[in-house]
Amino acid sequence: MPDGVRGRTVLIAGATSSSGLAAAHALADAGALVIAVGRDAAKLDALAAAVPPARTAECDLGAEADVRALADTLRADGVRVDGILHLVGGWRGGGGLAGQSDADYRALEVGLTALRHVTRAFWDGLLASDAARCAIVSSTAVARPLAGGANYAAVKAAEEAWARAMAQGFAKDARDEAREVRAASVVFRVRALAGLETVLAERFTGLWDAEAAAINDTVVQIDAA
């Protein structure tokens, strides 16, 4: 049976939101080493004060060189990441299909770019872990996109595709090494994240309590109570 998240190192990408704080609390309370990453130094300081065990790192996750430098720094410190919670993103929309501007799309696309950068930079470590867990927060809009949110739904769909490709990569690595799957990539879908921060944190932390093969390449919808 899985041993849970205790003793694991988990990176929260885009950690300075309320969801990031909730995840940091849940992970630290469960015995994980938390690495909270974001761009806002003041908010990272506040998170560090609220969750004293957490390590923070200021990094522009949309800049590949910065993410590579962060990964190199952690490796030099002897840190191997066992999990990633991807929280980089936001909402822009409205105005029907004609109102889906390039400016809004580019702003939203940063979430996908950050996901690509972070998972590539830490991929080898995730494969080496005996219990890697990764998750993204997507949207129910992927299953039912609306004209006024087409940009948003398109980016979230791309993020889901990337997360599912990670799942296939984990499964392939296990086959190639002739061993059981020990890593999992999961998509959490929400209609709106506000009010579900604690639930998301608990669901993510709980991924280490499940067998990797049972949850890899799954889509989990989180609904309001």
State what each model feature region is.
Residues R175-A225:
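C-terminal helical subdomain
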Residues V51-A65:
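Rossmann-fold cofactor-recognition segment
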Residues T16-S18:
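Conserved glycine-rich cofactor-binding loop
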Residues G62-D77:
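Conserved Rossmann-fold cofactor-binding substructure of NAD(P)-dependent oxidoreductases
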Residues A30-A46:
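Conserved glycine-rich Rossmann-like NAD(P)H-binding loop of the short-chain dehydrogenase/reductase
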Residues M1-I12, A212-A213:
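Flexible N-terminal pre-Rossmann segment of NAD(P)-dependent oxidoreductases
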Residues G96-G99, Y105-R116, L127-R179, R189-A192:
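Catalytic loop of short-chain dehydrogenase/reductase
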Residues L85-G94:
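Conserved NAD(P)H cofactor-binding loop of Rossmann-fold oxidoreductase domains
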